[in-house]
Each structure stands twice: as C-alpha cells, then as structure tokens.
C-alpha cells in the first residue's frame, strides 16, 4: 500500500491543511521547521527517549487478557496498557515530546485545552518537570464533571481557565486556547492534545503517539511470532488510535478498527460519532469530518466519556475512512458501561470510559474470530477519573 501522508502542505488527501489567520501562519510554519529539525537531531531523540523510559515508565506491557479471552471464546485478546503510563493515560507520550520542543524553541509558557482533564494533567505535569508556565482552558461543563483533575492541574502549578462559551466543552476550550495562543505567540507554545488543528499538529501528535503502535508490533511479534489479525482503539479526536494504527498502516493483513462514541445512539442527536454520521468541513484550522447541520453550524457532541465528545475527528482518520484502510464503528454509553464493568470484574483492570468503547467493540469482534488469531485493544487510560461519575450514573438508572 502506497501511503505517505501528510504531503508537504499538510494535507491527508483533501483533509488537514492550515486554515489559520495570518497572525498564526508564521508561528505554525516556525513550529513545523523546529519540529523537522528536532526529529533529525539525535540529542533531542535521546532526551525524549530518556523521559519516555525513566519518567513515563515505557515501554508499557502488552498483556494477555486470558479471562476475557475465555469469556468471548474467540480470538486471543491482548491489552496494550497505556493506562500504566505516568498520569494514567496515553496523553503524556505527546505532551512530553511537545514540551521538549517548546523548550528547544525558547518558549517560556505553554497553553493547552482539555476535555476529560487527562491532557490538561499530562500537560501540567511536563510543565512542572521542565519549568514551563502553564495555562489550561477547560469547558465549564467539563470542569464540573472532572473536579479532581482540575485540582490536580492546580496542584501541578497550572492556571485553569473555565470556558463558559458555547456548550462549555472541549470544542469551546480549543477555541479559547487558540485565541490565547494568537495573542501570546512570541513566548507561548500551544500543546494540541489530539491529532487535530492546523498542520503540523496532526503529524506531530501522531508521531509522538506512534510509540504505542511501534511497541505493540515488537511485543506482539515477540510473543506470537507474527502480527495481530486485528487492532482496536477508541476515537475522540483520535490520537491514541492514530498512535496505535500508524505503524500498522502498511501491514494490510492487520485489520484496524476505530471506535467512536454513539452516546444515546447514532439515530438520536446525542452522540459523538463523527465518522459514522458526520460530513466534511473545517474546524480549528483543519479540514475533517464534522458533526454539523445543513448551515455548517457545529453540532454538540455527546458521550458519557468527556474525552470523546469532540464534534470533529483528526484529518488522517478522515482519509483512512475514505480509503477503507480503517473500519470505523460506534459504541453507545450503555455498551461502554457494560464493557467497563466486565473488564474490571474479569481482569481486575479499571479502564477509562474512553477505552471502554474500544473494549466494548472488541467484545463483539473477538467471538467472530478464530482461536489462533489475535486481537489487540489499545487500553488508552485508566478509569480512576470516571469512577465517581459512573457511580452517579448507575444510581440514577
């Protein structure tokens, strides 16, 4: 398969690009240049690998979920344990890379958006480590849902700005963070939390997250002497999935499955299934599939999981859908909750609600596969942050 994206203008087929105001164009080009140089610099790579290993705790295990495998009665199920990273999710793979880039570019301050708070915590963490000032924008609805993560960020020295505009969720936090970056661009780096935004952000985030798929490939081959038949990951903006899928894109014998949030159901208005139900448009500097109405107004995304309710999806996922290399599906709140409880009871591993969507789809897929086949789930994060809201949800039902 001939796959070489993005092109030099940052496009993935028709998707991606740089839809930014003139005031930002210079910074975006400067970032691209700095990133290219850093990727060629052995000293930068060495420093990044040092932190990945000694600070974040990589590599993360590829765990054979024997009880889940028996329960499903099909393919062997493996979990890529991104929940075991420092801060409890895959997000820090990207934030450490971008923070080191910010230091290299001479920036003193970092701005970021966050939904569930995981990216905010991972950003505040690396800023504390590297002595950078940190400002995090978070929708007020998410601030309410994720009080503990807000406190955590503040403990780490970050300033958390609550965003009341719009629906007070991730989309609105991104708007404010971009606005802040425009006016502080001389001394501030924007750490985008997913494979979104204007080029080079989707590429930078994908490349820093690719450590997930690269490790998985190596670990699976060491265990089974071949590549897995199927790989499953959840999708909000799509960074854990892109990090898992990208190293497998050329291996056409490996089926790739992306799992979106169907919320209350894709037949309702309450979902975040952008690739299933969306249409093409531009948001936050990039062309991608979006949830929008006939007039092109962005619709609110809904999911029980704060990390999946973004109304767009990364431009590279948009392309991978169109060319059929990745198969995209959606899982409802109910199905994700069931999978959350099942994995917890069967394996003693509490997954994040985001990751539970991938687990739920894998539960449908595994029984259809042969017993000598392998299925890897990207367990993108741990569920500590969700226990309180799940308790509330279960009491209401």
From Swiss-Prot:
**What GO cellular-component annotations does this UniProt entry give?**
cytoplasm
Q: Which reaction does it catalyse?
A: (1S,2R)-1-C-(indol-3-yl)glycerol 3-phosphate + L-serine = D-glyceraldehyde 3-phosphate + L-tryptophan + H2O
Q: Which domain of life is it from?
A: Bacteria
A GO biological process of this protein is:
L-tryptophan biosynthetic process
Key words of the record: Amino-acid biosynthesis, Aromatic amino acid biosynthesis, Lyase, Pyridoxal phosphate, Tryptophan biosynthesis
Give the EC number(s) under which this enzyme is classified: 4.2.1.20
Q: Which GO terms describe its molecular function?
A: tryptophan synthase activity
Its pathway, per UniProt, is:
Amino-acid biosynthesis; L-tryptophan biosynthesis; L-tryptophan from chorismate: step 5/5
Task: Mark the residues carrying the PTM N6-(pyridoxal phosphate)lysine.
Answer: 91
Name the cofactor(s) required for activity, per the record.
Answer: pyridoxal 5'-phosphate
Top EC class, one word: lyase
Q: Which Pfam families match?
A: PALP (PF00291)
**Functional note:** The beta subunit is responsible for the synthesis of L-tryptophan from indole and L-serine.
Q: Which family does it belong to?
A: Belongs to the TrpB family.
The record's PANTHER family line, in alphabetical order, gives: TRYPTOPHAN SYNTHASE, TRYPTOPHAN SYNTHASE-RELATED
- Assembly with partners or alone: Tetramer of two alpha and two beta chains.
Tell me the protein's name. Tryptophan synthase beta chain
Question: Which organism was this protein described from?
Answer: Bacillus cereus (strain ATCC 14579 / DSM 31 / CCUG 7414 / JCM 2152 / NBRC 15305 / NCIMB 9373 / NCTC 2599 / NRRL B-3711)
């Amino acid at each position: 398969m001939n796959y070489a994206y993005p092109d030099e203008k940052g496009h993935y087929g028709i998707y991606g690009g740089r839809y930014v105001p003139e005031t930002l164009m210079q910074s975006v080009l400067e970032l691209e240049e700095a990133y290219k140089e850093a990727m060629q610099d052995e000293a930068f790579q060495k420093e990044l690998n040092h932190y990945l290993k000694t600070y974040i705790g990589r590599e993360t295990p590829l765990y054979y979920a024997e009880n889940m495998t028996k329960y499903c009665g099909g393919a062997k199920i493996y979990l890529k344990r991104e929940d075991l990273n420092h801060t409890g999710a895959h997000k820090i793979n990207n934030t450490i890379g971008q923070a080191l880039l910010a230091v290299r570019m001479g920036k003193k301050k970092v701005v970021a958006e966050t939904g569930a708070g995981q990216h905010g915590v991972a950003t505040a963490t690396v800023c504390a480590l590297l002595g950078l000032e940190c400002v995090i924008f978070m929708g007020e609805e998410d601030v309410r849902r994720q009080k503990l993560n807000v406190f955590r960020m503040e403990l780490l020295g970050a300033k958390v700005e609550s965003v009341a505009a719009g629906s007070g969720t991730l989309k609105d936090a991104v708007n404010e963070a971009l606005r802040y970056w425009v006016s502080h661009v001389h001394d501030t780096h924007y750490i985008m939390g997913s494979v979104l935004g204007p080029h080079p952000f989707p590429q930078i985030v994908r490349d820093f997250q690719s450590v997930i798929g690269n490790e998985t490939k190596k670990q699976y081959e060491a265990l089974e002497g071949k590549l897995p038949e199927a790989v499953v990951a959840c999708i909000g903006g799509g960074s854990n999935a892109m990090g898992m899928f990208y190293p497998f894109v050329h291996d056409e014998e490996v089926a790739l499955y992306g799992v979106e949030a169907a919320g209350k159901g894709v037949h309702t208005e309450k979902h975040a299934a952008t690739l299933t139900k969306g249409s093409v448009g531009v948001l936050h500097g990039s062309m991608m599939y979006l949830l929008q109405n006939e007039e092109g107004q962005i619709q609110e995304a809904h999911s029980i999981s704060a990390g999946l309710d973004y109304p767009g999806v990364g431009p590279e996922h948009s392309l991978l859908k169109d060319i059929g290399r990745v198969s995209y599906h959606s899982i409802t709140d109910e199905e994700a909750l069931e999978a959350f409880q099942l994995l917890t009871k069967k394996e003693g591993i509490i997954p994040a609600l985001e990751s539970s969507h991938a687990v739920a789809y894998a539960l449908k897929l595994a029984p259809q596969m042969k017993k000598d086949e392998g299925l890897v789930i990207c367990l993108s994060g741990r569920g500590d942050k969700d226990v309180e809201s799940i308790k509330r949800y279960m009491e209401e039902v």
